[in-house]
A protein has these predicted regions:
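GST-like domain detector, emphasizing the conserved glutathione-binding G-site
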Residues: 1-134
Length: 137
């Protein structure tokens, strides 16, 4: 029986893309199902009932959740080609450290960047309004 591999994710999610890239690196064929995060599918709710979030890797009807855990699972399951992690335990731990660091800091940085852009837009709008007032005096 051939393996069935399904990834539940969204195109814009770096976490979904992490899982998909790992599968591509390993040469694993899979079916991709785009999720609507506002109206979560019964499939997502069935296979990730705890967190109800993406990505989810479904391998032979068994779900694996959380992108770093999915990548580790992919590396261990399809271990005949292209290791995703270094062979040396220290280097592997180091790679996991940086992956975890990025997972924890990236959303924070993105949030700060979006807030900066929002404030900048408000500030520029106010400057434009004030300049218009001064021109009309």
């Amino acid at each position: 029986m051939a393996d069935t591999v399904v990834v539940l994710g969204t195109w814009a999610s770096p976490y979904s893309n992490r899982a998909r890239i790992a599968l591509l690196e390993k040469g694993v064929e899979y079916e991709y199902k785009e999720e609507d995060l506002v109206n979560k599918s019964p499939l997502l709710l069935k296979f990730n009932p705890v967190h109800k979030k993406i990505p989810v890797l479904i391998h032979n009807e068994r779900p694996i959740c959380e992108s770093l855990i999915i990548v580790q699972y992919i590396d261990e399951t399809w271990n005949k080609t292209s290791p995703l992690m270094p062979g040396d335990p220290y280097e592997r731990a180091n790679a996991r450290f940086w992956a975890d660091y990025i997972d924890n800091k990236a959303p924070e940085c993105l949030s700060s960047f979006c807030e900066f852009k929002r404030i900048k837009t408000l500030f520029e709008s106010r400057l434009s309004s004030e300049a218009l007032i001064w021109r009309n005096l």
